[in-house]
Amino acid sequence: MAKRKAAFYWMTVPALLLFFVFHTFPALQGVFYSFTNWNGFAKTYEFVGFKNYYYLFQDDNVGNAYWFTFKFAVVVTVIINVLSLLIAMGLNASIKARNFFRGVYFLPNILSVLIVGYIFNYLFSNVFTVWGENLGLGWLSTNLLGSQTLAWVGVVFVAVWQGIALNTILYLSGLQTIPTQLYEASGLDGANKWQEFWKITFPLIAPFFTINMVLAMKNALMVFDLIVALTNGGPGRATQSISHLIYTGGFEGGEFAYQSANSVIYFIVIAVISIVQIRYLQRRETDM
């Protein structure tokens, strides 16, 4: 028995040490530096208290980044969950080449975000514009990512295209847990497809809906790679997410301490949003 416990310790302790060294300790360092004026490379720094946090709320660039990120996250989360649920229901039906289509729809999830971003950057710049000119569509003949007002739509499109894959698989796994006898019984009672969805399907996949909503929102709030590959925050700062602002300001703009404070605030924001989502959606699960 003692040998078995020792084996568990030998497996657990190294993992915890690695997690602490490469995750927890740097995070605590970030909190520490958020109370200083360190620029990221100087040998000295001074403690400034909560000044960095105070100035964050006065910074228009920070406000614009939060506005874009929240707008982007809400739109992406809603679209991804609606489309992925519809696709999952289609893939769960008795159709030909069902396994083939399941593999095709999951393909975007295994591709690198940066690779997808650079590919779509090329498509928006060199392919879609040619299509627009040939079809006589003015809105498509110009690079969408170069528009101050519409660039975020292009980013949303790419994020949905790639993000929909994982959510579809999760919804599909939830749909496969529903006994077919329930649909047979509801058919005998005269229920239509819409009634079956709201009275049987959706209540029984509610836990999967909760997981997908939380994951989609969290991933959208943390968007970074896609912004770098598609717009790099431009044009101007029209598509600059909070993660992108923290990176560029902290590592390229000499604002390490200032953006450390920003990252602390943003961590709290994401944690609060996730907790609220989980509690609200889990309460709905029990009500259903």
Model-identified regions with their sequence ranges:
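A structural signal for multi-pass alpha-helical bundles of membrane permease subunits
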Residues: 3-288
